[in-house]
């Protein structure tokens, strides 16, 4: 991890870590890296996004880049526009699910996949050097504005077909998804009820679409007797789902269900997920001809493995899904359309979810300054291997140790000053016992680091 880029691009507090001055330099660095070309730029609804976008575009133009500004746009729309306009790259101004005082910058390749760590490292090198490409007055890049929403919906309707109409409640969380997700659902032929659908940087609910933040969505689904509720984070690269009974469907369960549906839709193949995904996915997709491949946390790692192995679906247990037949950009909006197609073909989610194996999953966060993370992980690795009776070790991203009926993942956050502990066990007592031991170990490691 470099000075600027984490697991999801550049992210931090506006006017502290992420400033207009930095955005200007990032624009220059991207233009220098590309040597010109064409770049699509979009932003989320945060109050600071317009300021950062303007600075970034200035930097791009100064290096001779042609900029297509699509304005307020969910991340999936930026990824789609990159391919639609045959751009060399794309940039999104967003902090995704982080609180409103945060913002960030994420760069995308011409195929819709996020920049890899190696590509980001090269951008960092250019940023640090200050040796930016400069063009004369008559070669400054051109700026034009575009709106790819109509084309996005048209293409999506070619891939997703419904036989019946459903009542869908869409909670966009005041984020960028509000300009697209409800409209796609309506064009699919559904009756749409919108919540938090006015774009605003003053978010009404917590942006991460989880059981707590979606209590309003769940209540609306029950009251309106809707078939499903769909929610997004700030840039709509994630999806959260509430079933027809008004219950939030755990990320692990939805990941398994949609992976299984993709296997039914496209035939047997490889499913890519991350090291923090549990046993349920493997157990659910194996009978359907699915082979699970695990990789580092982050959509770029998932997209990279999908491309390498020709996988048919990739997703994280955070509601981040990548559908390679559509794009290599994580897309919560297109995912919502697929959820409706799954309901149309297989039945209510409440019934489908009962088929997914359930294990006990616990998560914890331990505060840890960023400068202590590397040393703390060294201590954790050494102590965890001594303290737990494990059968398998995966160290591609943090430390994951497994036994036949449990696993634990110790991993430093790439976006926050915390250490994350994720674990799963077959029983609640075992899960609590493991978490108590794991938390104690991590707190001691941070203290010693």
UniProtKB/Swiss-Prot annotation:
EC assignment: 5.4.2.10
InterPro entries: A-D-PHexomutase_a/b/a-I, A-D-PHexomutase_a/b/a-I/II/III, A-D-PHexomutase_a/b/a-II, A-D-PHexomutase_a/b/a-III, A-D-PHexomutase_C, A-D-PHexomutase_C_sf, A-D-PHexomutase_CS, Alpha-D-phosphohexomutase_SF
CDD domains linked: PGM_like1 (cd03087)
Domain of life: Archaea
Residues at which Mg(2+) binds: 96, 233, 235, 237
Reactions accelerated catalytically: alpha-D-glucosamine 1-phosphate = D-glucosamine 6-phosphate
Post-translational events: Activated by phosphorylation.
Family: Belongs to the phosphohexose mutase family.
Cofactor section: Mg(2+)
Any one Gene Ontology molecular-function term assigned to this protein's record: phosphoglucosamine mutase activity
Active-site positions on this chain: 96
Manner of cofactor binding, per the entry note: Binds 1 Mg(2+) ion per subunit.
Protein name: Probable phosphoglucosamine mutase
Short name of one Pfam family: PGM_PMM_II
Any one Gene Ontology BP term: carbohydrate metabolic process
Keywords, sorted A to Z: Isomerase, Magnesium, Metal-binding, Phosphoprotein
Phosphoserine modified-residue sites: 96
Function in brief: Catalyzes the conversion of glucosamine-6-phosphate to glucosamine-1-phosphate.
């Amino acid at each position: 991890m470099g000075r600027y880029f984490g697991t999801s691009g550049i992210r931090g507090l506006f006017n502290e870590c992420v400033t207009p001055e930095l955005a200007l330099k990032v624009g220059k660095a991207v233009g220098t890296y590309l040597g010109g070309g064409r770049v699509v730029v979009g932003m989320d609804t945060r109050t600071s996004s317009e300021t950062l976008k303007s600075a970034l575009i200035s930097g791009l133009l100064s290096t001779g880049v042609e900029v297509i500004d699509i304005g307020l746009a969910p991340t999936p729309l930026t990824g789609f526009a990159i391919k639609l306009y045959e751009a060399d790259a794309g940039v999104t101004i967003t902090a995704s699910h982080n609180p409103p005082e945060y913002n960030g910058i994420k760069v995308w390749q011409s195929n819709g996949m996020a920049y890899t760590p190696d590509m980001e490292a090269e951008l960092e090198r250019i940023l640090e050097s200050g040796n930016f490409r400069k063009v004369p007055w008559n070669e400054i890049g051109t700026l034009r504005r575009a709106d790819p929403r109509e084309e996005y919906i048209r293409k999506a309707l070619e891939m997703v077909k419904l036989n019946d109409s459903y009542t869908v409640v869409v909670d966009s969380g005041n984020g960028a998804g509000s300009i697209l997700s409800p409209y796609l659902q309506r064009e699919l032929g559904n009756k749409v009820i919108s919540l938090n659908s006015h774009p605003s940087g003053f978010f009404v609910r917590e942006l991460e679409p989880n059981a707590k933040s979606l209590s309003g969505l769940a209540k609306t689904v029950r009251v309106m007797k809707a078939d499903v509720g769909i929610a997004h984070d700030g840039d709509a690269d994630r999806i959260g789902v509430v079933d027809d009974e008004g219950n939030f469907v755990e990320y692990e369960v939805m990941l398994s269900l949609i992976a299984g549906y993709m296997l039914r839709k496209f035939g047997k193949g490889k499913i890519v997920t991350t090291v923090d995904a549990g046993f349920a996915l493997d157990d659910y997709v194996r009978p359907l001809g699915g082979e699970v491949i695990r990789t580092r946390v982050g959509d770029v790692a998932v997209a990279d493995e999908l491309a390498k192995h020709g996988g048919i679906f990739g997703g994280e247990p955070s509601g981040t899904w990548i559908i390679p037949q559509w794009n290599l950009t994580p897309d919560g909006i297109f995912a919502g359309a697929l959820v409706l197609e799954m309901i149309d073909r297989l039945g209510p989610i409440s019934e489908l979810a009962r088929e997914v194996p359930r294990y006990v999953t616990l998560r914890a966060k331990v505060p840890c300054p960023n400068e202590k993370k590397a040393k703390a992980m060294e201590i954790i690795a050494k102590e965890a291997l001594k303290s737990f009776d494990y059968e398998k070790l995966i160290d591609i991203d943090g430390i994951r140790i497994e036994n036949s009926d449990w696993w634990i993942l110790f991993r430093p956050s790439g976006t926050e000053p915390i250490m994350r502990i994720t674990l799963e066990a077959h029983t609640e007592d075992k899960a609590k016992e493991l978490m108590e031991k794991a938390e104690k170990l991590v707190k001691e490691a941070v203290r010693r680091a």
